[in-house]
Each structure stands twice: as C-alpha cells, then as structure tokens.
Amino acid sequence: MQYRAIATCVSLLLFYQQLPAAGENLIVSQIATASTTPADATAKVETQRIYEVLVKMLDRWNARDLDGLMSVYWKSPSLLAVIDTEQFDGWENLYRSYKNQCRNPTNMGIVNSTRVQVTLLKPDLAFGIVCWTMRYPENAHASEVVGTTTVDLEKFDSEWKIVVLHTSFTEM
C-alpha cells in the first residue's frame, strides 16, 4: 500500500526529461523542483545506472549471452518473472527456461528498444518500462514481434537488480 501511495504521488508530480548522455529513448521521471539539490543529482545518477541495467538486458539478449542476461536479475528464489502467460518463480527456474527455449540462438531474434522509461520511487526501489520490437533476420518468414516489459528493480549494496519482470508481446 505504501509503494502505491508513493507511485501515485510521484506520478502526479512528474515531468519527463530526456537525458542527453543516455543515447537512446530514455524517459526519466523526476519530481519537479526549481533548483538542483544534491538529492536531485544523486537521483539522476541512480536513474542513469538503472537505465544502463535495462540496456544491458537488451544488449546481452542480442549477444545471445544468457549468463550476461541473467546477471541483471536478482539471483534469488524470490525473483518473479511473468513472460506472456508463463510465470517463473525464482532465478534458477527463469534461467532454466531461457536455456531450454534458446538452444538455437537464431530463434532469439534481435531486440530494439523503442522507449525506455525509468522512475526512481525510493533511493533503493525503481520501476522501469521497456517498449521493444524484435526481428528475426535469420528467418525471412518470421513475423516482427512488438512487446512491453515492465520491471521492478531494487538496489542491493551498490547494484541494481531486477526483482520482478512482466513481459507481454504480440506478433505483427
């Protein structure tokens, strides 16, 4: 309940600002203030770090590097991932599923983000949205896939990790 109240307050006070150093389609949600404080600067740094985690997730997928991909997830039995209609409880179960489904790397496709949005809810809790398209250049008959991934990230020590993920997609 407390997180919902924080998210509601944040969404009412947000403005969206492009970060020039981000390079892609990063939308940063921040509380509007008249001046920049040390807390604002810290929030910007943390938001950029979270963005980098989400970009790493996409990059590792495109590199067909499942170990690198899994490094962005919280290595815990409490990790929760819902991909389309399947639910995976725990890091090991998600990893095993990826290994089984991605035996042929050409079936993984190439993912491109169309939007990455990061909202820092608390100093150690964030929400992210990644809108993406996937192509299969090795398979001329495959459809393009369009999807959205939402993630909750927590900061453990100094590292941001995905603790909850939901992905939905459709073929075009």
For the regions a language model picked out, list residue spans one by one.
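Bacterial N-terminal signal peptides that target proteins for export
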Residues: 1-7
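Hydrophobic/aromatic beta-strand elements that line small-molecule binding cavities or substrate pockets
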Residues: 98-99, 113-119, 132-134, 148-154, ...
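Short, low-complexity N-terminal intrinsically disordered segments enriched in polar/charged residues
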Residues: 20-72, 76
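A solvent-exposed, acidic/Ser-Thr-rich amphipathic alpha-helical stretch
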Residues: 66-120, 143
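Short beta-strand edge/turn micro-motifs at domain boundaries
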Residues: 24-30, 146-172
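A short hydrophobic beta-strand element
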Residues: 124-134
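Bacterial N-terminal signal peptides
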Residues: 7-17
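Outer-membrane beta-barrel domain signature
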Residues: 138-140
